[in-house]
Swiss-Prot record:
Source superkingdom: Eukaryota
GO MF: RNA binding
Keywords annotated in UniProt: Developmental protein, RNA-mediated gene silencing
Protein name: Piwi-like protein 2
Native species: Schmidtea mediterranea
Amino acid sequence: MEEIPVKVAKLEANGSETRGKMGNRGGLRGTFRIVEPNLQPADITEKTGNIGRTVKLQSNFTKFSVLRSEKFMMYDSVFSQVGLSPKVKLQFIVRVCQENKLPGAFCFDGRRLFTSEKWHGESDIQEFSHDEKKMTLRLVSTILPETEEYYQMINVLLNNLQVMLGQERIGKGYFLSPNITKDEVPRNSGPTFFETNSFKVLGGFGTTLQRGTKPTGELTTLLYIERINRVLNDNSVMKAYNRRSIDQLIGRDIITKYNNKTYRISEIKEMNVDEKFEMGGRTLSYAEYFKERYNIRLTQGDQPFVLTRVKKPMRRERKKKDEEGVEKEKEKEAPEEKDMTLNIPGELCFLCGFSDQEKSNMDLQKNLGCVLKREPRERLDDIPAYCNWIKNSDAATGMCNKWQLKIDNKPLEIEGRELPPCDVISGGSKINEKMGDDWKFGRVQFDIKRDRKHEIDVVIVDRNDFQYKNFMNDVEQELRNMRIDARVGKVNTCGPNDVERCLNDAARSGSGCAKMALVFVPDDRVYAKVKSFTMSTGLLTQCVTTRNGTNRNDKRRKVVSSKTVMQIFAKFGYDPWTVEIKLRPTMIVGMDTYHNKSSKKSIQASVFSINSTFTQYMSFVVNSPKGRQEFHETLGKNFNLALEDFKKRYDILPQRILVFRDGVGDNQLQFTKNFEVDAMKPLIENIYKGNGFPVPQIIYVIVKKRVGTKLFNRGNNPNPGTVVDKEIVKPNFYEFFLVSQRTTKGTATPTNYNVLEDTRLLTKKGTMDPMAPNELQKITYALTHLYFNWMGTIRVPVPVHYAHRLAELVGKVHKGSNPVAINERIRNRLFYL
């Protein structure tokens, strides 16, 4: 008999009864969990705050109810015909259910069949036939309500509703068919459809279950509903292909319309459709394969092929012998995953999303903005529109009736709070009096010692240097306005291949003053050279694009020059502004990981605050550690250096270490808690004991920007500082949502903060309790005011954003397999700003 996968076997622990065996392919998928593990820190008793003004909000969640039963059946299905799509299989099951008058309700995910009544007799195996197709069902387990598997079954039901409504699965969501025309789109209700400039926007609805808490504290299950879109390009890879632009295609998503599957481009290779390959014991060409399998005739012999890496389940077979040693019928073993590379002709691959050039095409983005960037009042109609769409479909209504599925047709109303505004101070004056989250009209003043000299050399990667005189005049005027003692030094002009030579000259010239190179760059290649030089030599650089440097619009050019001067002196180590954050000695850490799609490398960056205002940071970056030992060594070394620097400045070690960690997916939370958090605590403990200090309080917070949750305040976006820590938060998490940035176009998306660890601190005066929710929420909001590249609040705390900027910069400019290194001269500078 086959081995039961772990997730199916866990049903027994939930009170379910496992009856049959099932391979990995049919096992319960671990990519999404409704009943998440309990990740709430052990010492936490209070998870909600109370400061700020209470506000009534709406969300894109709603209430729903579904069929209750003592237990449900889960079957593994095997079809006699190979290659049937999930949609065809579902249609087959519907016909079988009608012909055999099978009882109860059912839902199907392509392999697993869930039913509310028994569909088998005395044997756990049952066969059904229709129209020359045969399906074998094998009972795997019974499922009890309120278990993880029960909620997964309801998610399968919601996906089946999408199919009943005529949607097709593309990637992870359900959308209108890629081959649909404007005349076929449902009128008045249902998904949106838009066509323009060789682009097609396919609409759909995203639906997901989530556990929440009622105001009374009771557990509840909510349904998330939101319109979603998929952008398809009518141009195939073959049309878009150019040998010089291969790098722009690597890492992009494509769709193959013949089977509605999405892939990511790993490589592009020029091939011929008559080239042969082995499949199922046969040798055939690509042209023959697509003609036989999909009735598609390839039109061009030589063309670019998309190479994409996938994991393919491989089912092995073995012969089983009876007690007398006689071979019996072959029995299928559980499938194994095998790494494979698919070669797909470029004419069949259609690009999804936008290229960098298309993203910067203002006319294109304006045309599509009416669909992709919707206002809050439009989004509030998503839930009623979805409910009406179901009512207008007999098939979907019939399935809802069988499952007794009832969806409330109005958004869930919840309670939130608006945190008090933060005072932004520059030159001793408050500069955000008019608007708490925006101080672009405030006057920034740097606190620079008079005996400190600064020199800014200029490198123009363009032979026509006269075009940049107006910009340089604006820079010098801004220096005078800010009363900064700095002079513009030598101006060098060069070609793209000589930029390192000019930077070397700038690094060697001058003495006894802080040095900076202002570089005008024409493209990303030159920018990468400049930043790579910065990291290796320690020469600070400030880049300005050729377009901005030669802009003839005085107003726009002066805005850029003013921002450039501010960034230059922020990189020198001066603070344009500060926010008062009252904390006992604390170090705040930001961590993030950047994944380079084209090089397949991952870069991990971490920044450590080294001053009391949390404006200056020590930065580290490494190739992403591949094992536990490497991670421990890297983390320990970074913490040791940062804490040594902190001790030199203040003669003490911080009593509290607050870590904000980005780049962690939902299915990695348990691993992060067990791997990173549990590794960090003993490392810090050893450093403190070695220095004779008590172990600090450690708070570890996961920051998640990509969330589907939306919040609305009377049909508008919430004000900056709006926090929600009730009702839509998961009961076994210590989390909250915070809207920190003002959104004037489109709909604001809150950032999710999930606290994985919050320890107590043992001091001479006694035990210090974990950080109160009020304090953590206030600090988090205050840290969104300290990004020196924008005179306003940002979506995440600044340490996380700095770690993101650093990881992204290194990931894009670092070449080769050598370890990443940052010159010691700039380790304590915001050179990546």
